């Protein structure tokens, strides 16, 4: 068997393809010239090292050669994989091209790499065919993604025919997506080495659930209703969560991401200085089979800042229709996002502004772009104590309730007042001190 990776048509130019190229060369030499293969000892051990490093980075175990091949396939964005993501099984000549590539990859799966152990006098390949990672906590993937790839690796290795192999890949693309947008929940905006805008995965996401937020039932219901409409393809609005600091606005956004990820929801985090990149970001995601929320945390503008004008333009859209799969969610401590002066409320013209009322309306027009506006206010004393009691029960705090509430009242005075954040910080402190006492 020859490793014919140079004959692949769709699956080419892998970003992590160095190991593939090196191993393919070794396989071809094994089939044709074993003496020449022995001279490639350094290349062999370098490839094994690469597989082990990859396994450590992503938390892979089992046959990490197969897992590496699977990792390449599930991440490769091409005409076939992206069409399969949207429609599943597709028709047309592209299937013949994809089948050609999958036949080549199936041959790589079927090749017994333990033959290299005899050639190089080692047991490396036997080890990597049943590799046990020393640390299951992946640096770059969460366990859900890691397990999904490892299971897919076993499925592809068990495929009896190229057709079955191809069907398995199509099912994966349809069910879970392809590439970084398919495998990850959240992203940030960055730039590559050439300065081009790119969407970068955020690999560590807090596993917050919307129900973890105690209270705010009306606010949560409104947020859930809008988000559900969006992920289900119905009409939905841009959403602004505003109110006091520490009341759960950001946690609510994280909660809906975790709740609706499996239904195709993705979030891209953006900051004010990145607003100029938003049109390019939207161009990259508008034709993908996901629902994207562009998320702006703690959004507000001072008088001298003009970025809000760029954001208005992005939300409103120009000649091109705004994609149906993109919404903007923001959190802010300010009701109207832009700082307002007392004179803005008066019919008094600024010395340098002939049309002051127009200026005020321009400032306020940004907030009107958010069709859903949800208020998160500070809890009162009774509500704060209820939050403390609920969190204490959730975390197994054993302190008597009277003592617990007394300490909580003392805590909030010096930690930002009556807020859900202060309650959570207090419970974290109590849990930590109780654990220390038990040692």
Language-model features, listed with the residues they occupy:
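Intrinsically disordered, low-complexity N-terminal extensions of AAA+/P-loop NTPases
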Residues: 1-157
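Conserved AAA+ ATPase "SRH/arginine-finger" region at the nucleotide-binding site
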Residues: 349-364, 371-385
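Conserved nucleotide-sensing/catalytic segment adjacent to the nucleotide-binding pocket
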Residues: 265-268, 279-323
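Walker A/P-loop
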Residues: 238-270, 280-287
């Amino acid at each position: 068997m020859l490793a014919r990776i140079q004959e692949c048509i769709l699956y080419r130019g892998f970003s992590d393809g160095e190991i593939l190229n090196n191993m393919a060369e070794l396989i071809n030499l094994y089939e044709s010239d074993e003496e020449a293969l022995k001279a490639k000892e350094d290349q062999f051990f370098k490839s094994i090292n690469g597989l082990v490093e990859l396994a450590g980075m992503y938390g892979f175990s089992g046959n990490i050669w197969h897992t590496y091949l699977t990792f390449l396939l599930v991440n490769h964005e091409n005409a076939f994989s992206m069409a399969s993501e949207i429609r599943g099984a597709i028709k047309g000549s592209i299937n013949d091209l994809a089948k050609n590539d999958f036949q080549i990859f199936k041959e790589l799966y079927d090749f017994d790499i333990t033959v290299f152990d005899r050639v190089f006098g080692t047991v490396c390949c036997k080890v990597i065919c049943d590799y046990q990672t020393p640390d299951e906590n992946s640096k770059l993937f969460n366990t859900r993604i890691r397990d999904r790839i490892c299971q897919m690796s076993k499925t592809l290795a068990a495929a009896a025919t190229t057709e079955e192999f191809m069907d398995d890949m199509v099912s994966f693309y349809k069910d879970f997506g392809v590439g970084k947008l398919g495998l990850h929940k959240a992203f940030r905006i960055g730039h590559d080495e050439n300065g081009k805008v790119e969407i970068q995965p955020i690999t560590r996401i807090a596993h917050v659930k919307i129900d973890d937020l105690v209270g705010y039932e009306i606010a949560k219901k409104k947020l859930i209703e809008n988000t559900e409409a969006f992920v289900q393809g119905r009409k939905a609005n841009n959403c602004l969560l505003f109110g006091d600091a520490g009341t759960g606005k950001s946690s609510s956004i994280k909660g809906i991401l975790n709740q609706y990820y499996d239904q195709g929801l993705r979030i891209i985090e953006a900051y004010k200085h990145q607003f100029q990149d938003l049109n390019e970001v939207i161009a990259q995601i508008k034709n993908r089979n996901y629902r994207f929320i562009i998320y702006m945390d703690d959004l507000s503008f001072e008088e001298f800042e003009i970025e809000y004008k760029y954001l208005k333009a992005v939300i409103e859209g120009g000649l091109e229709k705004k994609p149906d799969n993109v919404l903007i969610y923001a959190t802010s401590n300010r009701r109207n996002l832009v700082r307002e002066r007392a004179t803005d409320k008066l019919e008094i013209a600024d010395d340098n502004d002939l049309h002051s009322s127009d200026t005020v309306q321009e400032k306020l027009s940004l907030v009107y772009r958010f069709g859903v506006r949800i208020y998160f206010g500070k809890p009162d004393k009774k509500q704060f104590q209820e939050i403390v009691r609920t969190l204490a029960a959730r975390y197994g705090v054993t302190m008597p309730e009277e003592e617990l509430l007394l300490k909580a009242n003392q805590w909030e005075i010096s930690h930002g007042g009556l807020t859900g954040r202060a309650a959570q910080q207090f419970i974290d402190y109590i849990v930590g001190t109780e654990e220390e006492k038990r040692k």
